[in-house]
């Protein structure tokens, strides 16, 4: 009887170990894939130079974006960048989720990929895993920015003001189109609510 119980326990323990090993393998695979996300600009796109982070930091409002799960359905999206003493950049993304009736926030960290006078950074919201963030076009007065990610499926139009003149928007979108971005898939972002943190 005790041998039978012992055998059952050993079998259960072995099953638990197998499940844990499967989970570990999945986690390692996810970490590997996340680590493979490129941090350099997409081929054919050059990040803005010269780039002044002191002028770039502060709050930006998202006017348009290509759809991704981490922002899906959000309105009133803003991104705030703050230079830290260690040279990194604190990133705070906020947006309103109408389906849940609540504000959502994600806090991350950005680091320069190369020279600090080039608008090419890598951003992480999940521990050691970074993705590319590249300022592909920038207003001389730092009033608007066109940002692309690790590939052309990531694109954002950012402005200092909540609302953007339609003619100016079309000019920025035309720049994105010239860079090979599928601008027909851009989603316009409304800004009708007041963020309680602002």
For the regions a language model picked out, list residue spans one by one.
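A beta-rich soluble binding module of mature secreted/lumenal proteins
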Residues: 2-11, 32-198
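Bacterial N-terminal signal peptides that target proteins for export
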Residues: 4-24
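Bacterial N-terminal signal peptides
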Residues: 24-34
């Amino acid at each position: 009887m005790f041998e039978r119980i012992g055998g059952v326990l050993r079998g259960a323990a072995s099953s638990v170990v197998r499940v844990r090993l499967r989970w570990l393998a999945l986690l390692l695979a996810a970490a590997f894939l996340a680590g493979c996300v490129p941090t350099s600009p997409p081929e054919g796109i050059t990040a803005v130079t010269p780039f002044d982070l002191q002028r770039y930091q502060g709050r930006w409002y998202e006017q348009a974006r290509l759809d991704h799960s981490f922002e899906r359905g959000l309105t009133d999206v803003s991104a705030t960048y703050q230079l830290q003493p260690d040279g990194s950049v604190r990133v705070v993304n906020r947006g309103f989720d109408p389906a849940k009736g609540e504000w959502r926030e994600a806090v991350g960290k950005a680091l320069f990929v190369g020279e600090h006078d080039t608008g090419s950074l890598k951003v992480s919201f999940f521990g050691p895993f970074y993705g590319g963030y590249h300022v592909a076009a920038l207003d001389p007065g730092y009033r608007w920015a066109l940002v692309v990610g690790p590939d052309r499926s990531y694109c954002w139009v950012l402005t200092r003001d909540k609302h953007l003149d339609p003619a100016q928007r079309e000019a920025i979108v035309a720049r994105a189109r010239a860079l090979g971005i599928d601008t027909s898939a851009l989603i316009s972002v409304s800004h009708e609510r007041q963020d309680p943190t602002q």
